[in-house]
Amino acid sequence: PRAAAAAIAMYEAGEKFRVDLAEGVPPLGMMRVGLHVGDAIVGNFGGEGRIQYTALGDSMNTASRLEAANKGLKTGVLISAEAAARAGRDDLVPMGRVTLRGRAQPVDVLTPRADLSPEQRNSIAALVAAHAAGDKNAYVTCATALTQIFGQDASIMFLIERLNETEKGESYVLS
């Protein structure tokens, strides 16, 4: 739970800093965060006289790819389903199944949306579930309703667009 809270707090602090820049300071890019769970090797990998403290491993790679995927998915924080299962949060919204750059195995991803009501989050979850189940009637009903509600929400509209381009069991491939 603390890792997800820290990821969201880091994103929010970065965005506040970016938005509150003093006049005359060049604009900064959007803050993005990826969160995954797994084993990692952490330590000093530098030589004598050169400290290079880092973390290595597949979980670190996946978190890095999730961070990069935010740009394409029009989100700020992406959390893998594995990390979300441990997060203990009720504000996470499924953003579908994606194949991350350089990865063969698709990942189900979620994003925090505390700005949405539980009903809105449940509607988005129903859309993703209908697509995953191959229930075209339920999917079209959900997509139509969500388009009316979230027509100006870039991440939700892009989710619908991605799901429209994939079939049951497929993932959206991020390049």
Regions found by a protein language model. Give the residues of each.
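Cytochrome P450 core scaffold surrounding the K-helix E-X-X-R motif
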Residues: N44-G47
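Alpha-helical scaffold within the catalytic cores of cyclic-nucleotide enzymes
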Residues: P1-V33, V37, D58-K71, A81, ...
